[in-house]
Every structure is written in C-alpha cells, then in structure tokens.
C-alpha cells in the first residue's frame, strides 16, 4: 500500500501539473509519455523506499536543493533557465538501467550529471523537456594498494578519490585535475589533466576498465563493450555513448616528498619577461617539473603568478630552475616540501586543512564563461602585453587566464591513442575565464570573446583546437537545420578531437545509432538526421 500510495502521488503530478504547460512542446503527447515513463520506472524500481530516494518531482521539497547542489556555473541557475521535469538520483546501478530502458521506450530525453562542472551546463540544462540522471549517490571508491588500482563510481569527485588514495598510501597518486569538486564521470571521459600531466599524461591515459550502461540498458565492462567503445569514452565525452557507472584506474608512483612553489609579479615588464621565457622552457624542462602561469586581477592590479610542482626536494628544484629558468627568480622561501596529497590541497587553495577537506562538496557562487586554445609557437611579448591590458579593463575584475604547460609524457603518447588529440607539438594550453555575480552577463562574456579574438593569430590553426572539458558552445551546436547531424557536428567536433572525430562518429554509429545519448554538442551518428 505504501508503494502504491507513493506512486500515485508522483503520477498525479505528471497528469495535473501546470508546470509542463509552460514548456513549449506538444503537451498532450509529452505529458502522456512522461507519465508512462514514470510508471515504467516506478514499477521497475518496485520498492517505495527506493522510489522515494530516486525520483524527485518539482512538487517535492527535495527537488530544488538536488537541482541546485551540483550547479557549478551560476549562469545556469537563473529563473529563466529551463528546468528538468524530473530528477533521478539512482542508488544502485540497476536504477540507471531502469531509467535508460524506460526513457528509451517512451522517448524521454536524459541528461547525465556527475559533478556538475560542464562549462556550458549541458549535464543539467537543455531547451526541450528533459530528465536529469544525477549520479551523486554512486560514489563508492575501492583502493587496491597491492595492485595499484582503484574502482571509483562516477558520482564521486576527484577530491574524494584523492582523499581515499592518500588515506591508504602517501606515495601513490593519480594524474587528474586540481579542482576537488569536479566529478570523475565527466572529467575522465573528456581527458582530464592536472599538475602531473607532464610526468604521467591525462587521467584518461590511466583508465584500464569501465562499467557503463549502454543505449540498450545493458551493463558492460571493457571486455563486453569492445576496444572501440572503450577507446571512445576515454576522452571523447562519455555522455555521447552511454552512462558511465564506474572507472577502474591505474595509480602512479610519486616521491614521498614533493615541492610546491609560487612566484608572483605585479610589474608588467618583469612579468612579460618571465612569461615570454617560460614559453621556451616549460614544455622542455624535466617532466618532474610543472610550472603554470596565471594572470588575474588582485586589488585593482594585474598579477602574474607562477605556481608549480616539483617531484623531489627543494634542493634539487632550485638547482634545476637556476640552471634552466633563472628568469623566474625562484628562491628557497618561495618553496615548501610536503607529501603529494598535501600538494593537492595546496593547489586547490584550501589552506593547511586535514586531507578530509578534499571530500567537501561546495557549490560555486559565481557565473562564468570560458574558452580554450592550444599554443604551438611562442607568442611575442606584444601579444602577452595585450592580454595584460585586457585584464585592466573594467569587465575583467574577476577574469583569469591560465597557461598550462605540455611536453613530457604528453608528447610521447600518440594523438590517436585516446580521443584527446592535443599532444605532441603543443607547448601549452590557454584557458580564458571570466567570472561575475548577478544576471548581467553580456559584457563579461563579450570580454572573453575579445580576448579569444585577440589570440587568433598566435594559437593552433586548421583547426583552431579546443578542449572538450572546457566546453564552449560558441564553437557551434545543433540548431535544427534539416541536414545531417554529422555535417553540423563536424564543424566543432574537429576542433575538440581533430582526426579522431571520424572514429568517434563510427563508434557512435555502432553503439547508439538512434542517438539516444545526445546533447547540443554530442558526437553524432552517420545515420541520423533530425531537427534537434
């Protein structure tokens, strides 16, 4: 009786709610499909306790908090941003299977969310009726120290992953990003990089198995899915092909002592000299050394920061930098020795907290827009100076430019080994970011566009590359033109994936020919023509 009562209450929502009437779509057909979907899902779950934990309708008190909890870009929390008709929070893998099977049967559009860090909000926003599949409850992490491997569910964050590794062993690590609240689901499936990329490459380079739910609702591991499918989800964006439930990753060794450091400059002349020289050094120096460049405003001044990680002692670091990069002016007082897991906290700017600070899930308070580029030839000082002046503009109060060095392991892995193609020949990647508070966004977004335009002659061309994990809808998206999605998707797909785009399309055509898993920039199948 309890289950039937709960099911009746949620079904009544779908048959009577005026919320759905405000969404422009064929109302009667979609409402019928949504009710049928809910009935299908509720019957498959078949337990009132599970149903109440998994299904959240707009009438539920939990709906708003669940929706908002993983919105990491406040640009997509405004009242006029489309909201889902339903949020599902699976508590076990079979719940995901049920959701996919029922959604496919009744034509329900699903968006899958892990940590909510999609830069354009595509894991939780679209302009047609949709359901969010939020994987927050699938976050178990099993560390096998003896075999140097981990099974991690995709609702976990990289901070939680780092914490579990650090608890077990201080000389094992994983080469993923620096922001601890990023979900491992999207991060690994887009490539994923951090301070260890020059020594060990991308996170995706160390994925050795995966469990997914495919478009037919089957749970598959690497052996069952095949090597092409497995290749595609390690850098090609998993949400185009399946729902990734968990990853098996291989851990890497790090020294018991590493060194972090930071050098800051406020003088434009001093900063430009160092940045210009950095371009000739950062990708060629020992792969034990990672030095990032960050440009941003600080108390109405432009500040250049050079934070870095060295896999070794301060003594050896200073010896190397004084020889290879004396322009940096690195001194012993700029450096601190610590364990690798402590360096993760340092780069995340979390202070001197215990390592369990990495498990905290915080919600971003600012809106932002971002773009990315890859640089293959050193920029002249005039170009760097132009960036400095852009940061002095009023709209750049919270802007940030991040230069991430490549080389090392990144140059040793062929560009076709995973879908991420930006390997050998790239000196560094630039990320252009601008943050703001409030609803007035146009001037801040235009600032990013101006900077991006300024850099056009100094970055990779044919195509001008971009990183899928720094998603940018300005590159293009499906707009409903009556031509093949392949022709539309290729225009931006080659920017993210270069020659690997064609192989991704072949995989998509094989594993999801009806395009069940899709979004505004998803990989298209060859066979599918539709108005989105």
Curated annotation (Swiss-Prot):
This is Berberine bridge enzyme-like 18. The FAD cofactor is bound via a bicovalent 6-S-cysteinyl, 8alpha-N1-histidyl FAD linkage. Its EC number is 1.1.1.-. Residues 80-254 form the FAD-binding PCMH-type domain. Its main location: secreted. Residues 1-29 form the signal peptide. The lineage of its organism: Eukaryota, Viridiplantae, Streptophyta, Embryophyta, Tracheophyta. It is found in: Secreted, Cell wall. The keyword Nucleotide-binding applies. Disulfide bonds join 40-102. There is a cross-link at residues 117-179 (6-(S-cysteinyl)-8alpha-(pros-histidyl)-FAD (His-Cys)). Gene3D superfamilies: 3.30.465.10, 3.40.462.20, Uridine Diphospho-n-acetylenolpyruvylglucosamine Reductase, domain 2. It is an enzyme of class 1 (oxidoreductase). Pfam families: BBE (PF08031), FAD_binding_4 (PF01565). Keywords: Cell wall, Disulfide bond, FAD, Flavoprotein, Glycoprotein, Nucleotide-binding, Oxidoreductase, Secreted, Signal. The keyword Oxidoreductase applies. GO terms for molecular function: FAD binding; oxidoreductase activity. InterPro entries: BBE, FAD-bd_PCMH, FAD-bd_PCMH-like_sf, FAD-bd_PCMH_sub1, FAD-bd_PCMH_sub2, Oxid_FAD_bind_N, Oxy_OxRdtase_FAD_BS. Belongs to the oxygen-dependent FAD-linked oxidoreductase family. Glycans are attached at residues 30, 33, 46, 59, 147, 169, 262. One of its GO terms (cellular component) is plant-type cell wall. Its cofactor is FAD. It comes from Arabidopsis thaliana. Binds 1 FAD per subunit in a bicovalent manner.
């Amino acid at each position: 009786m309890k289950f039937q009562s709960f099911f009746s209450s949620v079904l009544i929502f779908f048959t009577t709610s005026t919320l759905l009437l405000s969404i422009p779509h064929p109302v009667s057909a979609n409402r019928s499909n949504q009710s049928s979907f809910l009935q299908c899902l509720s019957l498959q779950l078949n337990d009132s306790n599970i149903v109440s934990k998994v299904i959240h309708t707009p009438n539920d008190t939990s709906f708003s908090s669940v929706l908002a909890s993983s919105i990491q870009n406040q640009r997509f929390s405004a009242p006029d941003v489309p909201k889902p008709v339903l949020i599902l929070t699976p508590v076990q893998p079979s719940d995901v299977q049920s959701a996919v099977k029922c959604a496919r049967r009744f034509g329900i559009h699903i968006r899958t969310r892990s940590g909510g860090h999609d830069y354009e909000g595509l894991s939780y926003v679209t302009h047609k009726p949709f359901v969010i599949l939020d994987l927050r409850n699938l976050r178990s992490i099993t560390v096998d120290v003896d075999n140097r491997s981990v099974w991690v569910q995709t609702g976990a964050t990289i901070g939680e992953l780092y914490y579990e590794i650090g608890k077990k062993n201080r000389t094992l690590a994983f080469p993923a990003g620096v922001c601890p609240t990023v979900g491992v689901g999207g991060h690994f499936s887009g490539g994923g990089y951090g301070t260890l990329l020059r020594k060990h490459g991308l996170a995706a380079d160390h994925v050795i198995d995966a469990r997914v739910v495919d478009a037919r609702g089957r749970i598959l591991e690497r052996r069952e899915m095949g090597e092409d499918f497995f290749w595609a989800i390690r850098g090609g964006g998993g949400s185009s092909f399946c729902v990734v439930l968990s990853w098996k990753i291989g851990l890497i060794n790090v020294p018991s002592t590493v060194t972090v450091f930071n050098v800051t400059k406020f003088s434009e002349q001093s900063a430009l000299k160092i940045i210009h020289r950095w371009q000739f050094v950062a990708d060629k120096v020992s792969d034990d050394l990672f030095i990032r460049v960050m440009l941003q405003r600080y108390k109405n001044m432009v500040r250049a920061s050079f934070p870095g990680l060295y896999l070794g002692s301060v003594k050896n670091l200073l010896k190397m930098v004084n020889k290879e990069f004396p322009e940096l002016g690195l001194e012993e007082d700029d450096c601190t020795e610590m364990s690798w897991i402590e360096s993760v906290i340092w780069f995340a700017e979390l202070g001197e907290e215990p390592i369990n600070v990495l498990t905290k899930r915080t919600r971003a308070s600012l809106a932002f827009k971002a773009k990315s580029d890859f640089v293959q030839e050193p920029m002249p000082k005039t170009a760097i100076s132009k960036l400095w002046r852009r940061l002095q503009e009023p709209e750049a109060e919270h802007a940030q430019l991040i230069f991430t060095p490549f080389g090392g392991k990144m140059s040793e892995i062929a560009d076709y080994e995973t879908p991420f193609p930006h390997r050998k020949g790239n000196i560094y990647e630039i990320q252009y970011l601008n943050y703001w508070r409030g609803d007035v966004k146009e001037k801040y977004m235009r600032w990013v566009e101006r900077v991006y335009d300024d850099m056009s002659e100094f970055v990779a061309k044919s195509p001008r590359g971009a990183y899928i994990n720094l998603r940018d809808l300005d590159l293009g998206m499906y707009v409903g033109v009556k031509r093949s999605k392949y022709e539309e998707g290729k225009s931006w797909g080659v920017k993210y994936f270069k020659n690997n785009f064609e192989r991704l399309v072949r995989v998509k055509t094989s594993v999801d020919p009806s395009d069940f898993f899709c979004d505004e920039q998803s990989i298209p199948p060859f066979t599918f023509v539709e108005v989105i």
